[in-house]
A protein has these predicted regions:
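Short, Lys/Arg-enriched anionic-surface-contact patches
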Residues: 3-25, 73
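Long, charge-rich, low-complexity alpha-helical segments
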Residues: 25-77
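Short amphipathic alpha-helical surface micro-motifs
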Residues: 1-3, 54
Length: 77
């Protein structure tokens, strides 16, 4: 999945946050919904997205996870 084909960031739209191209749907909103257990189909219906948009959001997050290390505090669940 080449997420660059479906995701863009424009300072004039949603404060420059990553969004699905041609929309104001932020990638973080898609990921928040999926992380909360919302089925991909429900996210697609709720935000008028295509499956490829949701897949691009996940691929974008995967790339970020490979690039960014978030320190974990021992003993904190």
């Amino acid at each position: 999945m080449n997420w660059q084909e479906r995701i863009t960031a424009d300072p004039a739209i949603c404060h420059g946050r990553a969004c699905i191209k041609g929309t104001r749907v932020m990638v973080s909103v898609i990921l928040d919904n999926l992380a909360a257990g919302e089925p991909a189909e429900a996210v697609m219906r709720g935000y008028h997205l295509q499956r490829e948009d949701v897949e691009a959001a996940v691929a974008y997050a995967a790339d970020l996870a490979r690039e960014t290390v978030i320190p974990f505090i021992p003993g904190v669940a």
